[in-house]
């Protein structure tokens, strides 16, 4: 495996991150110098990183019980705990079943410390609500199609749930140690999985305004308030894109971190990276060798039918379309989704360099078929499911 890809996956690994930050002793867990005593610990792990996060504690704790909720299709057994498959990104009956099992566990089991392991995807994987499933599904479908931002959609979702927006804490009979692997650009931890154990600053009135804005005011009657203060959960960020980029900075040549919050059109981001390479000598004062690092979640706007593609594939095609090749420099661009899946493909991302030539590139750009093109030239990255997600990582080496 290519060294850069290997390092990205290693630096994104929740098990390794936990091992660096968490000390487990016979009767206490220590996180960044904070001590959490226990005699009967329990685990609830939910999200794309739940398997590796749970495995760390299962390996380290002699006696532990709990639930681990994974995306459907990524099932893998674990000792000592029950593993539940649910759906992502859509809420389904499996989401409600998972949420119900979590509440039953919290109410009925005997534990004196709840270790809550949270990562991206949890919002869909686990739900518990007074709103009937069919109605909640209808609301979610309409929200997704409404043109609202992800933040606006999540505000509404929190106010329709009995466990999002800090409300899961109401069901725990013991202190909660929340450890978080974040996929949210910008660092808002309450947005990870809709923050089941974190306080939320948004209000019912905020959610009403959002629903009215897109003609869904009829659903306002289902809104409930989120928790503004949480006193029984202690929350720690264990891993995110900024941590990964800082570690990459230590191993590459002359690193420059562009941003950890890349958003907007994926193709345009690739075009912008090409522009940096094209003008680095005259405009930016950059001289090879240097390495540009970035992370985030650019998007792809689909109109009509699309082929096999994803945001990272589009970044690579945008870059290849516009980068100027000459004998003065060489380049290599890595674009990888740390969860192992980019778009509707089986690939995590792609690697392209000055020798990568895609014939008829405009066709693949406009048909959103980036991986059909990149497969043909052997520039795809296939990792399989990685059991983590800190979003997308971009590394551009210029030599």
UniProtKB/Swiss-Prot annotation:
Gene Ontology cellular-component annotations: cytoplasm
InterPro entries to which the protein is assigned, alphabetical: GK-like_C_sf, GK_N_sf, Glycerate_kinase-1, MOFRL, MOFRL_assoc_dom, MOFRL_protein
Molecular function in Gene Ontology: ATP binding; glycerate 2-kinase activity; glycerate kinase activity
Database matches in Gene3D superfamilies: Glycerate kinase, MOFRL-like N-terminal domain (3.40.50.10180), MOFRL domain (3.40.1480.10)
Obligatory cofactor(s): Mg(2+); Ni(2+); Mn(2+); Co(2+)
Binding site for substrate: 48
Temperature dependence: Optimum temperature is 90 degrees Celsius. It exhibits more than half of the maximum activity at temperatures ranging from 70 to 100 degrees Celsius.
Reaction equations catalysed: (R)-glycerate + ATP = (2R)-2-phosphoglycerate + ADP + H(+)
Sorted UniProt keywords: ATP-binding, Kinase, Nucleotide-binding, Transferase
EC number of this enzyme: 2.7.1.165
CC cofactor note: Magnesium. It could be replaced to some extent by nickel, manganese, cobalt, calcium, zinc or strontium.
pH dependence: Optimum pH is 4.5. More than 70% of the optimum activity remains at pH between 3 and 7.
Subunit structure: Homodimer.
Family statement: Belongs to the glycerate kinase type-1 family.
Function text: Catalyzes the ATP-dependent phosphorylation of D-glycerate to 2-phosphoglycerate. It can also utilize GTP, CTP, UTP, ADP, AMP or pyrophosphate as phosphate donor.
Record-given protein name: Glycerate 2-kinase
Taxonomic classification: Archaea, Thermoproteota, Thermoprotei, Sulfolobales, Sulfolobaceae
Gene for this chain: gck
């Amino acid at each position: 495996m290519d060294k850069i890809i290997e390092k990205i996956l290693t630096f994104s690994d929740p098990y390794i991150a936990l091992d660096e930050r968490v000390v487990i002793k016979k009767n206490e867990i220590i996180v960044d110098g904070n001590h959490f005593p226990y005699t009967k610990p329990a685990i609830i792990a939910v999200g794309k990183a739940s398997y590796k996060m749970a495995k760390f504690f299962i390996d380290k704790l002699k006696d532990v019980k709990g639930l681990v909720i994974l995306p459907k299709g990524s099932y893998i057994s674990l000792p000592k705990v029950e593993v539940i498959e649910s759906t992502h990104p859509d809420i389904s009956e499996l989401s409600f079943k998972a949420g119900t099992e979590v509440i039953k566990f919290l109410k009925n089991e005997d534990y004196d410390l709840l270790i809550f392991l949270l990562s991206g995807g949890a919002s869909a994987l686990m739900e518990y609500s007074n709103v009937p499933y069919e109605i909640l599904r209808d609301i979610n479908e309409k929200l997704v199609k409404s043109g609202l931002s992800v933040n606006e959609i999540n505000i509404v979702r929190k106010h329709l749930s009995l466990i999002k927006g800090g409300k899961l804490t109401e069901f725990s009979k013991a202190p909660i140690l929340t450890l978080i692997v974040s996929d949210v650009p910008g660092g808002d931890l309450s947005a990870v999985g809709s923050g089941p154990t974190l306080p939320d600053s948004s209000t019912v009135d905020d959610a009403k305004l959002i629903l009215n804005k897109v003609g869904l005011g009829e659903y306002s009657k289902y809104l409930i308030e989120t928790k503004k203060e949480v006193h029984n959960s202690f929350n720690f960020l264990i891993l995110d894109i900024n941590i990964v980029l800082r570690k990459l900075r230590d191993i590459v040549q002359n690193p420059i971190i562009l941003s950890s919050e890349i958003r907007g059109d994926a193709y345009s981001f690739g075009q912008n990276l090409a522009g940096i390479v094209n003008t680095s000598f005259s405009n930016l004062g950059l001289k090879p060798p240097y390495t540009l690092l970035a992370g985030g979640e650019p998007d792809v706007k689909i109109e009509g039918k699309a082929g096999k593609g994803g945001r990272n594939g589009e970044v690579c095609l945008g870059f290849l379309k516009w980068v100027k090749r000459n004998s003065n420099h060489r380049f290599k661009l890595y674009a990888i989704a740390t969860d192992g899946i980019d778009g509707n493909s089986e690939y995590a991302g792609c690697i392209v360099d000055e020798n990568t030539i895609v014939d008829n590139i405009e066709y693949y750009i406009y048909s959103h078929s980036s991986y059909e093109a990149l497969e043909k030239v052997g520039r795809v990255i296939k990792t399989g499911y990685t059991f983590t997600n800190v979003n997308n990582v971009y590394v551009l080496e210029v030599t």
